[in-house]
Curated annotation (Swiss-Prot):
GO MF annotation list: hydrolase activity; toxin activity
Compartments, as annotated in UniProt: Secreted
Tissue-wise expression: Expressed by the venom gland.
Family: Belongs to the venom metalloproteinase (M12B) family. P-II subfamily. P-IIa sub-subfamily.
Superkingdom of origin organism: Eukaryota
Name of the protein in its database record: Zinc metalloproteinase/disintegrin-like CdtV1
UniProt keyword terms in alphabetical order: Disulfide bond, Hydrolase, Secreted, Toxin
Subunit structure: Monomer.
Cysteines engaged in disulfide bonds, as pairs: C5-C14, C7-C15
First and last residue of the signal peptide: none
Organism: Crotalus durissus terrificus
Function: Snake venom metalloproteinase that impairs hemostasis in the envenomed animal.
InterPro entries given in the database record: Disintegrin_dom, Disintegrin_dom_sf
Main location: secreted
Amino acid sequence: ARIECDCGSIENPCCYATTCKLRPGSQCAEGM
């Protein structure tokens, strides 16, 4: 399963808000 990021939150610790891409080695949206 591929995890996509929301490009809305700049404070998102797992995604780059500027590029809307997941940061390397980050696990988000698991159990949310």
